[in-house]
Amino acid sequence: MEQHESRPRVRRGFLQMLSIAVVAIVLASVAGVGLGMAVAGQKCSTSQACWDPPYKKMPDIAPPIVRTNKYLPVPDAARGPAIDPVKGYRVESLGAGAFLVTEGVYQALLIVHADGVVLVDAPPSIGAKLSRAVAEVAPGKKVTHLIYSHAHIDHIGFAGEIAKSNPGVTIIAHEETLKLLARAKDANRPLPTATFAGVATPFSVTAGNQSLRLEYPGPNHEPGNIEIFHDASKTLMLVDVVFPGWMMWRRFALAQDLPGYFETVRSLNGKYDYKTLIGGHLNRVGTKEDVSTQLAFMSDLHAAAADGLATTKLGEGMSATDQTNAWAVFDNYIDRVTIHCVNAVTPKWKNRLAAFDVYIYDQCLSMEQSLRIDGPSM
């Protein structure tokens, strides 16, 4: 019982501390007074902004919008099998009629059944190659069902062409995805013809001799982003959440709900008996071990950002004049929290996750922001 009660107390104390800090900044700005700790900077014209060399203790990783001459090498473990340059895509059998299709950056799933093929997602980057992949694994068969993982164009933007070439195809999605697509009015993303509702409420899709379980775990990457499980092949597909072997795309892949994102990742390995994970991106499939690795990284990131927020002093190193600018004080504070976060996780993770250096600043920025406005995710 004591363990269950400790987290709310920590959360309240953490949020109270941040609220007091924000109020102090705003009051100082309104009153026109500094927060102390001013140091002399370079000489600047009073009519324009200027900036100094980087902060103290800057990581040896280039910060955002600074040109990088050479990125860290991609570990061999993060690379998938080579793509045939002539075909421009590859198909990987996952067993029991399930197949991965990828051009190296995006992924789709095919499930071959007695009467046709179930297609999960239709990334425009793969485009017409999807139809060639269907013909390769199921000659003469049509796509009978198209399942949308979620509403984003980069994952289902070729759905309109799939619908045209497969008349009568059943398009399935969560009702939250339907709402987003109805608002978008995009002919390249036809509205679902069948939907399901609810959170943590499994929905079964049967096609010929195959069946899939669809479930919306709750807010994560985007409202309506679902888990697709094919029990026969022990394949789980969840898009834009787990990136096997790689750093997540920028800002947790632009997750709209970070606490929900954390909970979704945390639940996967205990919830599903799977051996193969399709994350929707890059050129290899994942495993339960990949999920555990990403969760461990997320845990370290969470701790590093929280520690940075708690130990970084507001206004330190700023001129007295700039400390009357509430936005500037907080920008400076967040910069230094981010530097603390990056420095904390780099030694352990920079050689374990591909593209760590590409998006580590983005992840720290998202994490500190979520901690400030959502509270702890762990």
Outline where the language-model segments fall.
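Divalent-metal (often Zn2+) His-rich catalytic cores of metallo-beta-lactamase-fold enzymes
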Residues: F262-A326
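Metallo-beta-lactamase
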Residues: E176-G224, D231-A232, F262-R266, Y272
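Zn-dependent metallo-beta-lactamase
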Residues: M17-I20, S29-D115
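Conserved beta-strand hairpin/beta-sheet module of binuclear metal-dependent hydrolase folds
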Residues: G88-E136, E227-H230, K234-V239
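Active-site neighborhood of phospho(di)ester-bond hydrolases with catalytic His/Asp-centered motifs
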Residues: V120-P123, K142-H152, I172-E175, P217, ...
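C-terminal regulatory/interaction regions
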Residues: L15-Q16, I20, G32-P59, L314-M378
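Active-site HxH/HxHxD metal-binding segment of metal-dependent hydrolases
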Residues: A40, K129-T206
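N-terminal Sec-pathway targeting helices
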Residues: R7-A24
